[in-house]
Amino acid sequence: MTQMTVQVVTPDGIKYDHHAKFISVTTPDGEMGILPNHINLIAPLQVHEMKIRRGGEDEKVDWIAINGGIIEIKDNVVTIVADSAERDRDIDVSRAERAKLRAEREIAQAETTHNIDEVRRAKVALRRALNRINVSKK
């Protein structure tokens, strides 16, 4: 059976490198499922979870919190260059919960001062924290 090589790379280095038979990511246009022999493609990624179904007998599923970036698909090699990425097993949930609370406070404070840029920045931080929390529960 044909499989793809999946690599997730961040400024901190390679976070994931395995073979897979299915990948699910989220782009600005919505969720995208990727199977082997997919057409070549480059697309931006949203802050969202990434699902990777590995090949083999155990059909293991890996989950990664992707916090923006791009995906490139070429010749059964899927490369994701992400701003940051964490596997479900590596997420510090208490840290993510603290980040969520901090972002919620920053949103409330920025809204009272009508600081639109700060509201946007805090909402991105909130999405990232919620993404990490959701992936940690998979």
Curated annotation (Swiss-Prot):
Q: Which residues form a coiled coil?
A: none
Similarity section: Belongs to the ATPase epsilon chain family.
Q: Which CDD domains match?
A: F1-ATPase_delta
Look up the domain of life of the source: Bacteria
Matching Gene3D superfamilies: ATP synthase delta/epsilon subunit, C-terminal domain, F0F1 ATP synthase delta/epsilon subunit, N-terminal
- Keyword set, alphabetical order: ATP synthesis, Cell membrane, CF(1), Hydrogen ion transport, Ion transport, Membrane, Transport
Q: What is this protein called?
A: ATP synthase epsilon chain
- Membrane topology field: Peripheral membrane protein
Organism lineage string: Bacteria, Bacillati, Bacillota, Bacilli, Lactobacillales
According to its UniProt record, where is this protein mainly located? membrane
Q: Which GO terms describe its molecular function?
A: ATP binding; proton-transporting ATP synthase activity, rotational mechanism
Among PANTHER family, the record links this protein to: ATP SYNTHASE DELTA/EPSILON CHAIN (PTHR13822), ATP SYNTHASE EPSILON CHAIN, CHLOROPLASTIC (PTHR13822:SF10)
In the UniProt record, does the keyword Ion transport occur? Answer: yes
HAMAP family the UniProt entry points to = ATP_synth_epsil_bac (MF_00530)
- Any one of the GO CC terms: proton-transporting ATP synthase complex
Q: What does this protein do?
A: Produces ATP from ADP in the presence of a proton gradient across the membrane.
| Subcellular location field | Cell membrane
Which SUPFAM superfamilies does the annotation name?
A: Epsilon subunit of F1F0-ATP synthase N-terminal domain
Q: Does the keyword Membrane apply?
A: yes
